[in-house]
Each structure stands twice: as structure tokens, then as C-alpha cells.
A protein has these predicted regions:
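Absolute protein N-terminus
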Residues: 1, 22-23
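N-terminal signal peptide c-region/cleavage motif recognized by signal peptidases
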Residues: 17-19
């Protein structure tokens, strides 16, 4: 009987470990990059494509290279595109959501140093599932002058009046 209990305990631990691993990798991320900066530039953007097998919300992000990191959207107000903070960005199950220059993106503000092309920075995504449970995922993101080949194009800004 003790060996049965030991096997049951090992099986339970294996299931718990598998569940914990699933929580660590809730989304697939592709094409991630951060736009390089020049000395004196206070902010830049991070861009990527996100896909999740379950409905999630991107509720924030953080990085040690910026004093403030927020999820932003571009919104047309009258004839002007304006950037504004989003409290949550929906990531529908099994659908790709692309963060692009000129569209939804992660804004890095109050940069602590210039971000040189060729370097890599950590960004931690803050997510919530349908039950409200917090999930984080940290990735290493390359700093580039231009989008990588195959990255989604910048969002169209539309017609700005005549």
C-alpha cells in the first residue's frame, strides 16, 4: 500500500508541475521587437504578435529599461491620431493580435538609457485570464532600427482630412 501512495503522490506532483508550466507559457509570441532610440529620446514602442489558446487580456507590461511601460492604442479623434493608455487589450482565444507601429503597442516611457540597435531587453507581459487570475510572461526582445522581415506593417492612419 505505501508504494501505491508514493506513486499517487508522484503522479499528483507531475500534474501540478505540468499545470504550473502551462501557466508560465500562456501565449505564443512572434515577431517581437523594440524600436531603437537615439540619445535624449524619452520613449519608444515594443511590437509583436500574440496568440493564446484561451481568452486573455493584456493588462500591462514592465521592463527595467523604462520608468513607465503601458499598453497603448492609437485612436482617431477628429482628424488627429492620438495615443492613449489601454487598461486591457483583449486577446481572443486562437486569434492573433498584432501590436504595430501606429496601432496598438507597448509604450516604453522615461527611458533610463538609449536603446541601441542590436541589443536585447527584457519585457514582462502582465495578463489576466477569464477568472481574473494574474499571469506573467517574460521575454527577451531584440532592439532594431526597422521591423524584422515578415513583421506586420504599421497600422494605417486613414484619411486625415482634405
Amino acid at each position: 500500500m505505501p508504494s501505491y501512495l508514493l506513486r499517487s503522490a508522484i503522479a499528483a506532483l507531475a500534474c501540478a508541475a505540468a499545470g504550473a508550466f502551462a501557466q508560465q507559457s500562456p501565449i505564443t509570441i512572434s515577431g517581437a521587437w523594440v524600436r531603437a532610440t537615439v540619445p535624449g529620446q524619452g520613449g519608444t514602442g515594443a511590437f509583436m504578435t500574440l496568440q493564446s489558446p484561451q481568452a486573455l487580456e493584456l493588462v500591462g507590461a514592465s521592463t527595467p529599461v523604462a520608468g513607465v511601460t503601458q499598453v497603448h492604442e492609437m485612436k482617431l479623434e477628429g482628424n488627429t491620431m492620438r495615443m492613449q493608455h489601454l487598461s486591457a487589450l483583449a486577446l481572443p482565444a486562437h486569434q492573433s493580435v498584432t501590436l504595430t507601429p501606429g496601432g496598438n503597442h507597448i509604450m516604453l516611457m522615461d527611458l533610463k538609457q538609449p536603446l541601441a540597435a542590436g541589443s536585447t531587453i527584457p519585457i514582462t507581459l502582465q495578463l489576466k485570464d477569464a477568472a481574473g487570475a494574474a499571469i506573467t510572461q517574460t521575454l527577451q526582445v531584440p532592439v532594431l532600427q526597422q521591423p524584422p522581415a515578415g513583421a506586420a506593417p504599421a497600422a494605417a492612419h486613414g484619411h486625415h482630412g482634405s
